[in-house]
Amino acid sequence: LDKQPTSRGCFLCGRQNDIGLKMNWLNDYEARQVWSEVIIPEGFNGYPGVVHGGIVAALLDETAGRALMLDGDHDGLFITTKLEVKYHLPTPTGEPLRVVGWVIKRGSRFARVGAEIRLPDGRVTAICEAAVARPPRKFFETCDWDSEKQYWKIVE
């Protein structure tokens, strides 16, 4: 299994984000999926012991989008244009979670991707489907991607 790149400031993967989760994603080429394991601490909860729904959505969104990097295209970035999340069970804080993402359909400019969060026993707490698109050049100017790109790398 190969690791995917991480960044410096991203809430989920940023290595220099003091309040971030510092997640890593792995490519499972045989299953055509990407996955990450994470324990979400209290402080990212909505109700006590339950991960906030917005954090759940962020986990799903990032993991679904990362499925597009399975073929090694780490520079062909996409942005989410629509995200539909179905919450099946409370996602617990303080317990190991596995977030899995996959590609549903991919084109050159648009794609549909999905992801789910699994408990150690395999039950799914939440699932998403997202529409993503290649961002226009203006997006990269707004986020100053050219100067940030140097921090987008695989960390061992």
What are the language-model segments listed below?
Residues 63-98, 103:
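Hydrophobic beta-strand-centered segment that forms part of the acyl-chain substrate-binding groove
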Residues 46-49, 78, 137-139:
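A short, polar/proline- and glycine-enriched secondary-structure boundary/capping micro-motif
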Residues 37-39, 84-86, 100-102, 116, ...:
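Residue-level recognition of well-ordered beta-strand positions that form the cores
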Residues 31-35, 82, 96-98, 112, ...:
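Intrinsic-disorder/low-complexity, polar/charged segments enriched in Ser/Thr/Lys/Arg/Asp/Glu/Gln
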Residues 35-59:
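A conserved, well-ordered hydrophobic junction motif at loop->secondary-structure transitions
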